[in-house]
Amino acid sequence: MKNVKTLLILSLFAINGLFAQTVFEQDGYLSNLNSFQFFNKEIASFIQIPDQWNDQQFHLRWNTRLYHGEHWSAKMSLRNRIFTGYSWEENLFGFKDALEVDVLDLTAINEEKVGMQQQIDRLYVQWERGNWNVRLGRQRINWGIQNYWNSHDLFNQINFFDFDYLERPGSDALRIQYYGKGNTSTQFAVNENIQAGLYKFNAWDFDFQTLLAKYYNDYVLGLGWAGQIKEAGFKGEFAYFINSESQVKELVGSIGIDYSLQNGMYFSSGCLYRSQADDFNPFALINQDISAKNPMPFAYNFLHQINYPIHPLVLVGMSLIHNEELDIIFINPMLTYSISESIDLMISSQNMWMWSDDTYENLTQTVFTRLQWTF
């Protein structure tokens, strides 16, 4: 993949040098995310961490795009983050280790009290002509169809709890897409570890997609759909993984419904099933290894969400995740306020309880505030 990255970077310079009349666009944002953590005192004492701490993150994102003629374009996006607080200082729950490091990442500052990471999470060249689209480089390959948990998202799995990553991760890959007749399309995408094909078509007023892939050591077959049942949306996707070495088989699937009222209120509910979920670890939600086979650490997961614009500038909402195996509840209330056309304020919290000794015991609570300026 290093050769692919080298070729990509050289291609970017070639496009910029060979074509004098190139359209350049840019945008981005600057945000400050504060978090205040409150941990269960007994558990905190047992694992020898404080029961309260706070962290700060400053995030500058810069997106650039080049266009030449009708067929060629390129994109590069920089993600620059500064970290301070207890999680950075103590490398809490492997905080530093979780920061992705590769050829296009640079830890510019690694001091005891502060850290800075500069990451290129989009860097690709794209060619389009007629029904064809070819893209090479670090990109988002969004194959998920269900709202929350996506077993078809082989290249860029979403972490539901990482709400601050608005653009979501990218992957180094080559993707070829062809748009056929009658709302059909075919995609092929490959990188070092994944080779996959996706076919989309429409039938019975539903959009369907089929997936065939080699995903690390697994062969994958998948089916997904999206459509309407009366006025409610109905989506789902399932993937069947067969390990080429151990022959272990795993089914990962999710279904969901959503509904919007005329006053703007939005409801959504979904369920995720994993046939080979790992042994339960309540803190896997905090520090889990997200993948298409492991979008959540439990076998059965239920999510319910409601959003409502109480004012044209104010949106409130709440998400609830429930695991019935050990009766864990995760609640995530949220409020966003549009201060101006370019400045937004968000206040949110993530709270987790577990049923123990005939009562729900609080495990952890985190309060977030984020101020963001978009340019």
Task: Give, region by region, the residue ranges found by the protein language model.
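Residue-level signature of outer-membrane beta-barrel architecture
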Residues: 22-24, 64-68, 126-129, 178-180, ...
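Outer membrane beta-barrel
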Residues: 65-184, 354
